[in-house]
Regions:
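Metal-coordinating catalytic core of metallo-dependent amide/deamination hydrolases
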Residues: 6-25, 29, 37-150
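Active-site-adjacent C-terminal substructures of enzyme catalytic domains
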Residues: 139, 149-266, 278-282, 290, ...
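Loop/turn positions that initiate beta-strands
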Residues: 270-273
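Short aromatic-centered micro-motifs
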Residues: 298
Length: 306
């Protein structure tokens, strides 16, 4: 079911660090044209210590070179590499005893993420990996409840994870746990759309007091879309959120999902001054014109982007 990840792993391993940086830079420029000024980038397509560090170094270069701010997340626990098939305990040891310490030593990631899902890492394994990451200064995040509700969203709340992604089949106990733990539910409607899957119970989350964010989940295997204006439209159409709720989800709550709500996500004194000027009569129109690029101007850190 997850052969797509391993296919991308093969391609990523064969690419140089500079090739990865250049390709990602093109994607960032396209994101910027649609109004994205900050994004999170995850590793997880190397699945060896050297290859994961290579991806994180590429992300670091992007942060130095590109107008878009890029926040790095280590996700060595994205899949079980083919060379560890039948020996998952050994790979988890590699993650906890070698990869995470190396990432922390080089200070090239802010977060540690795990794919907690049937066939990938179970809740107990995910807890061990995320707790190890926290011990080394990496804030926990989790991919949870995309296909089966195996306890990932509950774990997110218990650990106080900054965010939990996907949550398509998030159960009531997961919603309650995230509300108690202050975890942001980062929903990925374009992935649901592309895969023909269900959509997360966004309204139940909002009513329970869970902060809801939305992101593109741009990746080679399950979501080739990086247009956040398409994501905005899906938020209204599929989650039945109001335009105001969707705006909050892709701005302030999105910033909270990467620990930056004190710097970006709203126009306030003391923040960085990132904003988008729209060619639209009102907010409803942006949601209505799903997928269209209505960006008129992008301002990054108080300066107009050419």
């Amino acid at each position: 079911a997850f052969g797509g990840i391993l296919s991308t792993v093969k391609s990523t391993r064969s690419a140089s660090e500079e090739e990865l940086t250049e390709k990602a830079s093109l994607a960032l420029s396209e994101m910027l044209s649609f109004g994205t000024t900050t994004c999170e980038a995850k590793s997880g397509y190397g699945l060896t210590t050297d290859e994961e560090l290579k991806q994180l170094r590429a992300i670091q270069k992007l942060q130095e070179r590109h107008a878009v701010d890029v926040v790095a997340t280590f996700m060595g626990a994205h899949a079980l590499p083919s060379e560890y098939k039948g020996n998952r305990d050994a790979y988890i040891r590699l993650l906890c005893e070698e990869m995470i310490p190396a990432v922390a030593e080089q200070k090239i990631a802010k977060f540690c993420d795990v794919f907690c899902e049937t066939g990938v890492f179970n809740a107990q394994e995910s807890r061990k990996i995320l707790e190890t990451g926290r011990k080394y200064g990496l804030t926990p995040k989790i991919h949870a409840d995309e296909i089966d509700p195996i306890g990932g969203s509950v774990l997110a709340g218990e650990l106080g994870a900054v965010s939990a992604e996907h949550l398509i089949v998030c159960p009531p106990e997961g919603i309650s746990s995230m509300a108690k733990g202050g975890t942001v539910a980062c929903l990925l409607p374009a992935t649901s759309f592309y895969l023909g899957a269900g959509f997360a119970p966004a309204r139940s989350m909002v009513e329970a007091g869970v902060p809801v964010a939305m992101a593109s989940d741009f990746n080679p295997g399950s979501c080739p879309c990086l247009n956040m204006q398409f994501v905005i439209g899906l938020g209204c159409l599929k989650y039945k959120l109001t335009p105001e709720e969707v705006l909050t989800a892709v701005t302030l709550n999105g910033a909270a999902a990467i620990g930056m709500a004190d710097q970006i996500g709203s126009v306030e004194v003391g923040k960085l001054g990132d904003l988008v000027v729209w060619d639209a009569p009102d907010l409803d129109y942006i949601c209505y014109r799903i997928g269209s690029n209505l960006v008129k101007k992008v301002i990054k850190r108080g300066r107009m982007v050419p």
